[in-house]
Amino acid sequence: MIYKKVHDEQKSLFFHKFKCQWVPRLGSFLPKRVRTLKIANGATAASVFHQKVKGQWVPRLGSFLPKRVRTLKIANGATAVSVFPHKVKGQWVPRLGSFLPKRVRTLKIANWATAVSVSLHTVKGQWVPRLGSFLLKWVRTLKFANGATAVSVFSDKAKDQWVPRLKFFLPIRMRTLKAVNKATAFPVFPHKLKGQWELRLKSFLIMRMRTLKSANKATTVPVFLHKVKDQWVPRLKYFLPIRMRTLKDANKATAVPVFPHKLKG
């Protein structure tokens, strides 16, 4: 029977390969260790390397995948992507065209990216599609950072909360975060955040200013921090020292300057 088959095919056969089955499309014999013979038979002109047939044949990739490729179903969905066996410890992502290691937990989020390159040494946190980068684990306010579109996130400053309008991270010592969020394009200086931000004054007031409500009534008047020992007078646009007793009379003045060195009476 074997001699008749060989005569009909008119091909020179090597008897040391008669341990398996002849594949007409491949024009060669496949050894017994090829388990997925049905899949290999579907290949047309792909060359079969015997030393690599320890795993499973993938027709679209045109190569054999080793046994350590667990996510073979996902790899089969790839068309012309080359598979590197030394990197298949994790899971194959068709859109990224690369294998992600096991430490990538947020693989579902990474799959949303299309042509973004994934840096393996940075994937300790979570992937943010809009930022195009990975955020570390100590970024707690990730939901706020996701709201930003093209704003770059600095990991070394992400100790507290991200403010989209300010495009900056606010430190922990800022208590009046709600007031700062109302600002749009005003830069926030962390070294001045000991008091409270005032939108009208466009500056931070120190904690020792007691009459904050009166100071809020001022619009574009600069506040001098070294003079806020007493009370702010809107009409005079000046701070009155503690030794001024007749504060009510001074409030009645409109544009009269008050000189502190003359306020002995």
From Swiss-Prot:
The lineage of its organism: Viruses, Duplodnaviria, Heunggongvirae, Peploviricota, Herviviricetes. It comes from the Viruses. This is Protein B8.
